[in-house]
Amino acid sequence: HLLSRRQRQMCIRDSEYTKDSKVETSSIVVEPYTSKILAIIGGKDYASSQFNRATQANRQIGSTIKPLLYYLALENGFTPATTFLCEPTTFKLDDNSTYSPSNFNDKYAYKDVTLAQAIAVSDNIFAVKTHLFLGTDNLASLIKKFGIKDVKTNASLALGTLNTNIYNLANMYNCLASEGKYNHLYTIEKITNDAGKVLY
């Protein structure tokens, strides 16, 4: 496949620049609608490390969670023009604790911003306000539908404090790319015997 071949070429090229570096990366390319995995890369050199970072390395996913949050918002009456005030904010939570997230580089609009603007600049204040408005259980429940079990229901979930791997992240994003159609990602289409009979 042209795309997966191009991806492999890019990884080989990049590895030439980082031969002496210990930095690793991973990547998955998925075909929307079919959920077919076209390419998966778990590291730059299988000979030196068989650890598959695409499926085994769990990390906080950060702002990549926001499209899922805003999908929920749109499903619950928000529009791209829905606004919240963007300014430094301390949130008082149900357990009487407080939470004070910040925007990247402490940059704030100090005025109402729209959902469309918020996702364009990855505004954290807007994300947390949206998350708390919807109820923290909603985002956690959506994530669990993708088979991710250990999801903490808290305010910071809106900013991607979820620990998971890019296989699971690709699984979630593929559902969005497939217009809501959800199928598990797969690498094997079928298995045949030497007579061509389909065994799987």
Residue map of PLM features:
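Single conserved hydrophobic/aromatic residue that forms the stacking wall/gate
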Residues: 1-12
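Second-shell loop/turn segments in exported
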Residues: 15-16, 25, 51-59, 101-106, ...
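A short, well-structured edge-of-sheet supersecondary motif
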Residues: 18-47, 142-144, 189-193
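Short active-site loop at a secondary-structure junction
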Residues: 20-25, 48-68, 81-87, 156
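Active-site SXXK
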Residues: 35, 58-86, 118, 172-176
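Conserved catalytic neighborhood of penicillin-recognizing serine enzymes
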Residues: 78-139, 182, 194-200
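Short, charged, amphipathic alpha-helices and their helix-cap/turn boundaries
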Residues: 134-150
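Active-site-proximal helix/loop microenvironment
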Residues: 146-199
